[in-house]
Amino acid sequence: MKNFRLSEKEVKTLAKRIPTPFLVASLDKVEENYQFMRRHLPRAGVFYAMKANPTPEILSLLAGLGSHFDVASAGEMEILHELGVDGSQMIYANPVKDARGLKAAADYNVRRFTFDDPSEIDKMAKAVPGADVLVRIAVRNNKALVDLNTKFGAPVEEALDLLKAAQDAGLHAMGICFHVGSQSLSTAAYEEALLVARRLFDEAEEMGMHLTDLDIGGGFPVPDAKGLNVDLAAMMEAINKQIDRLFPDTAVWTEPGRYMCGTAVNLVTSVIGTKTRGEQPWYILDEGIYGCFSGIMYDHWTYPLHCFGKGNKKPSTFGGPSCDGIDVLYRDFMAPELKIGDKVLVTEMGSYTSVSATRFNGFYLAPTIIFEDQPEYAARLTEDDDVKKKAAV
């Protein structure tokens, strides 16, 4: 699939109206990503992990397409409730839940929960008696960018005891869930986890617990600045085939976050300062590591950077606007000579970027604008139509 990317002309015309830094989100691209997953992984319903990007327009779009939602807190439930999303379309997938989150779940009729420790059972039983629960198991995957199984997931050998304890406490033991880790490059990790889950389903049946649901988490990868050589269609189809083979009568869902929005958002930022240090040019941008580049620190991520300057390229350093020396974004990046006021485009900025940005040093948060609401979108459609007409002649 082709990722969303603004042209140089679009960047410059947008920046004439909107002060940088700002994010540009393409709803068309989000919808394309959603439909791609439904086409190649049809056995798994979608619970979008809204922590990746809770932009209201994106949430409304996905709800309209039929997506459900993975929520982690009372705040996320409140956002969805205000958008008209019913609690039956949510799963409270944070394995550790606080009192405020459990109260919100009860208030908004959220009935699905995940957990991985006995300490959660009593909390859920009191706050949401009779709720549907899935035990989260730890799985192995050394090909994931971000490991989620050190902090989360019960040992496999304890999973059914946890479900039995939940059942004894008046909760409904619904199923098993796992997460292979963020930005997973291996289909094998999913396939191995599915085999483990199948064994647990069979053992649960022998114990008198009929499990009906399986949550395979997220982890589907998107491109970064280092490039990515993964056939997503083949990856999803292989997983779908295993689900069909191992779980023909089970309700299955997935929780994509990064995959759904990562390729659908661009950042437009400006050079606000230039200097030379150690014979290398430095360019200071008006967005940095405490803003939308927070994923460099929190998410081990490298975002594709695009400069529009002319001339020979040389190794350059890019930094953010804060007074913190750690606010360095790129080192030895091959860039043409830039000057103050030049615009820089950063792609694949749709997930775990603005959502973890801060107001450190008092800098304003970069707003998100919707590309389809801008005149540049209409102009792009007109240009595409003209190209098609010429090609047809």
Swiss-Prot record:
Gene3D superfamilies for the chain: Alanine racemase, Lyase, Ornithine Decarboxylase, Chain A, domain 1
Disulfide bonds: none
Listed result of changing residue 322 to A: 29-fold increase in substrate specificity towards ornithine. 70-fold increase in substrate specificity towards ornithine
Assigned GO CC terms: cytoplasm
PROSITE patterns in the record: ODR_DC_2_1 (PS00878), ODR_DC_2_2 (PS00879)
Pfam family, one: Orn_DAP_Arg_deC
Pathway: Amine and polyamine biosynthesis; putrescine biosynthesis via L-ornithine pathway; putrescine from L-ornithine: step 1/1
SUPFAM superfamilies from the UniProt entry: Alanine racemase C-terminal domain-like, PLP-binding barrel
Residues at the active site: 323
Enzyme class: lyase
GO molecular function, a single term: lysine decarboxylase activity
In-chain residues carrying the UniProt-annotated modification N6-(pyridoxal phosphate)lysine: 51
Annotated control of activity: Inhibited competitively by both alpha-difluoromethyllysine and alpha-difluoromethylornithine.
Biological processes annotated in GO: putrescine biosynthetic process from arginine, via ornithine; spermidine biosynthetic process
UniProt superkingdom: Bacteria
Quaternary context: Homodimer.
Additional remarks: Mutagen studies showed that it is possible to convert S.ruminantium LDC to an enzyme with a preference for decarboxylating L-ornithine when five amino acid residues (Ala-44, Gly-45, Val-46, Pro-54 and Ser-322) were replaced with the corresponding ones found in mouse ODC.
Membership in a protein family: Belongs to the Orn/Lys/Arg decarboxylase class-II family.
The protein's name: Lysine/ornithine decarboxylase
Organism per entry: Selenomonas ruminantium
